[in-house]
């Protein structure tokens, strides 16, 4: 099964311009994307990330029930064109009884353009807290047609909660383990999960980062945060789609990659540099 992760430098608040550049990027990789089954885009892919408050992000919020939802519409067009599942990050608002709640979200779109699931970022980074509400919990879908078990997570979700929880608590990785244990109790035929990480992850060190290479420190850290899965010999596919570039005071690290967790090891099947627009594609047994 073929998977892809998109790495992109969005311009803050320039949604239409970002869509144009993303289409160009997809066109440049159209041959590699043929027969891809799942394509993952970064966190807040069309809007950019570094909004300082709810007022500044207000014009870019999307409601999935609205006719005007650029991120969902773009992902649906991608899914239709490549006949694939698509995951995309976007800033969301929901209305209930006249009250708006804002979320940092990802959406899963089917090859038939169906909106299958929307996930709300559970662990918020400092920038998110200026406008977003914390999601109620992590995400695990036990059986998506053709894909099997899948989990969407967003950036800070794999960190210790609020950077205050014990490092060894490994909240997200242990959540996946518990979900898999439950699925194995229900069925003896559970395929390995696909862990989809949409990111706006910062560089590990502004002073030493080499933009012509992957950010190896971050790559190692992401693997470490999934170590309970590795140490338990859990087989999984990990798709990391991270943005790159500098946005005001934040510098993002790229290094989008495809990893396989198998027999107690993390195997890298493809990785992009810290500073480039690109799509990493890999084919793995599901």
UniProtKB/Swiss-Prot annotation:
It is found in: Cytoplasm; Nucleus. Its EC number is 3.5.1.-. It is an enzyme of class 3 (hydrolase). Its main location: cytoplasm. One of its GO terms (cellular component) is nucleus. InterPro entries: C-N_Hydrolase, C-N_Hydrolase_sf, Nta1. It comes from the Eukaryota. The keyword Hydrolase applies. Pfam families: CN_hydrolase (PF00795). The keyword Nucleus applies. Gene3D superfamilies: Carbon-nitrogen hydrolase (3.60.110.10). Keywords: Cytoplasm, Hydrolase, Nucleus. Residues 1-286 form the CN hydrolase domain. The active site is at residues 43, 121, 155. One of its GO terms (biological process) is protein catabolic process. One of its GO terms (molecular function) is protein-N-terminal asparagine amidohydrolase activity. Deamidates N-terminal Asn and Gln. Component of a targeting complex in the N-end rule pathway. Belongs to the carbon-nitrogen hydrolase superfamily. This is Protein N-terminal amidase. The gene is nta1.
